[in-house]
A protein has these predicted regions:
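Short, mixed-charge low-complexity intrinsically disordered segments
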Residues: 32-67
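Short aromatic-glycine-(Arg/Gly/Cys) micro-motifs in beta-strand/loop hairpins
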Residues: 2-31, 50, 60-62
Length: 67
């Protein structure tokens, strides 16, 4: 199984926007560009990384691919 991360933040209009993080540390909705992890633990570790810190005001959720 593979895992990926969903990020959510409140946009300037006050509404939540949800997106996935790409390998380039960009927001994406393109499945082919999702940053995948081999284990849930690796994905959880990413949420505490310097890359994740660049996404200020975001909350992260680890998703199992195929759910």
């Amino acid at each position: 199984m593979k895992y990926y991360i969903i990020a959510t933040r409140v946009n300037l209009s006050g509404y939540p926007e949800t997106f996935t993080i790409s390998y380039d540390n960009e927001a994406t909705d393109d499945y082919d560009n999702f940053m995948f992890f081999d284990t849930e633990e690796e994905a959880q570790e990413w949420t505490k990384s310097k890359q994740a810190a660049e996404w200020k005001d975001c909350t992260f959720e680890v998703i199992k691919d195929g759910e």
